[in-house]
Amino acid sequence: MLSPEAERVLRYLVEVEELAEEVLADKRQIVDLDTKRNQNREGLRALQKDLSLSEDVMVCFGNMFIKMPHPETKEMIEKDQDHLDKEIEKLRKQLKVKVDRLFEAQGKPELKGFNLNPLNQDELKALKIILKG
């Protein structure tokens, strides 16, 4: 039987370890999705170079190749890119929250600038006008 102090330390370590595992799993998933996104980008680039729109193209699905019409293939890859972009963005938002919880559990201060968002087009134009004037 563990002493109350040892049990408290053990619970703390288990909590920190679980939070760290969640952070690492999300990071790994982001890397995997980004790899797939880059492969799609390569495929789209190859389709753009191929000017014969009337011909069917070979597409690899897992371990199987399928012949598909050029326009449908391009549309399918673009939809997949949009889905991957949204999924990666969602994971990044979740990752920020999980990292904050991990730092809180470890007693570390919150990361400065970690929750910043980029300027949109209108904000950027306004900033340029202010800096020029």
Curated annotation (Swiss-Prot):
Ranges that cross the membrane: none
Keyword Chaperone: yes
Annotated keywords: Chaperone, Cytoplasm
GO cellular component: cytoplasm; prefoldin complex
Function per UniProt: May play a role in chaperone-mediated protein folding.
Record's subunit section: Component of the PAQosome complex which is responsible for the biogenesis of several protein complexes and which consists of R2TP complex members RUVBL1, RUVBL2, RPAP3 and PIH1D1, URI complex members PFDN2, PFDN6, PDRG1, UXT and URI1 as well as ASDURF, POLR2E and DNAAF10/WDR92.
GO terms, molecular function: unfolded protein binding
Main location as per UniProt: cytoplasm
Compartments (UniProt record): Cytoplasm
Family: Belongs to the prefoldin subunit beta family.
Entry's Gene Ontology BP terms: protein folding
Protein name per its UniProtKB record: p53 and DNA damage-regulated protein 1
